Amino acid sequence: RVARGLLTQFRPGEPVAVWAGNGPDWVLLEFAAGLAGLTLVTVNPAYQAEELAHVLGHSGAAGVFLRSEAQAEILTQVRDRLPRLREVLTLGDWPAGDGPLPEVDPASPAQILYTSGTTGQPKAAVLTHRGLTNNARLAAEAVGLRAGDVLVNPMPYFHVAGCGLITLGLVQTLGTQVVLPRFDPGRMLELTERYRGTVIGGVPTMLTALLAAACRAPRDLS
């Protein structure tokens, strides 16, 4: 339903950006964009006007999904520099549609993710449908994900680890993802205890923070 709604606003092959933090609606958009043959441009929700203008302009995004009025105000500052941007939509407020879905080429672009830009402007990394899903499958196999595993995802969705390796890896192994809006070590341990998490993932600084939080407020993670 969401994919069909997207096709009332965009044409298959067009880039569509998502500028928002983690949430179930983000994942819905990820899958719907793939089904609709759109290229999802993932945007760091911490971006300010100039960074946002660079990513939206460079990718040629035809639309952007966002959540807050504050984001809309930031976008207004650079909107006149983005001639290809037609639509500004609220994430979760899906357009209605009932048309057919296209046949999507596995070699076509699925997502455009941007690097951190530590030595200059963020650079685009284009991921195909086949590459994205195979990478997630191989990563899941490498860490030993199994059917029934539960993981509280601490990684941001604008990063390939969050939206690709973990999200798609769990889907392919019939696991369960608990969505964490943003990394909070105490909250992550609380949810891991509540939902009986079987796997913990994250970058080293996150794991260090989790160990410190567990010392302050121990949880039953058995």
Residues of each region from the PLM?
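Conserved pre-ATP/AMP-binding loop-to-beta segment of ANL
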Residues: G97-Y114, G120-Q121, G144-V150
